[in-house]
Amino acid sequence: MKLVTSITVLLSLGIMGDAKTTQPNSMESNEEEPVHLPCNHSTISGTDYIHWYRQLPSQGPEYVIHGLTSNVNNRMASLAIAEDRKSSTLILHRATLRDAAVYYCILRD
């Protein structure tokens, strides 16, 4: 019998200047499965980078990844950026309980 653990990821709105991002309040996933965290940023300017941070319980924010116009990968996650840059998706490839956190999508130059 395989034990399936559910992971809840909380998301938060990020606002810097006039740029506003919107995300769902929370998402759930089974352990060891990919999690796709969407972020809409329709007011993005041409010089704004898309930054993702996460905050684990009882800790400060931690950098995850950032990008400008193309898709980006690192050891922690991938960032898929839409061609018009008005939305992006943070992808956690194999979520574990250690990934349960508040995730922030923020725009800044």
From Swiss-Prot:
Glycosylation sites: 40
Matching Pfam families: V-set (PF07686)
GO CC terms: T cell receptor complex
Disulfide-bond pairs as recorded: 39-105
A GO BP annotation: response to bacterium
Leader sequence segment: 1-19
Keywords: Adaptive immunity, Cell membrane, Disulfide bond, Glycoprotein, Immunity, Immunoglobulin domain, Membrane, Receptor, Signal, T cell receptor
SMART domains: IGv (SM00406)
Subcellular location, record wording: Cell membrane
Domain Ig-like: 20-109
Entry superkingdom: Eukaryota
InterPro entries assigned: Ig-like_dom, Ig-like_dom_sf, Ig-like_fold, Ig_V-set, TCR_complex_component
Subunit structure, interactors included: Alpha-beta TR is a heterodimer composed of an alpha and beta chain; disulfide-linked. The alpha-beta TR is associated with the transmembrane signaling CD3 coreceptor proteins to form the TR-CD3 (TcR or TCR). The assembly of alpha-beta TR heterodimers with CD3 occurs in the endoplasmic reticulum where a single alpha-beta TR heterodimer associates with one CD3D-CD3E heterodimer, one CD3G-CD3E heterodimer and one CD247 homodimer forming a stable octameric structure. CD3D-CD3E and CD3G-CD3E heterodimers preferentially associate with TR alpha and TR beta chains, respectively.
Functional summary from the UniProt entry: V region of the variable domain of T cell receptor (TR) alpha chain that participates in the antigen recognition. Alpha-beta T cell receptors are antigen specific receptors which are essential to the immune response and are present on the cell surface of T lymphocytes. Recognize peptide-major histocompatibility (MH) (pMH) complexes that are displayed by antigen presenting cells (APC), a prerequisite for efficient T cell adaptive immunity against pathogens.
Name listed for the protein in its UniProt record: T cell receptor alpha variable 26-2
Originating organism: Homo sapiens (Human)
Organism phylogeny: Eukaryota, Metazoa, Chordata, Craniata, Vertebrata
Gene: TRAV26-2
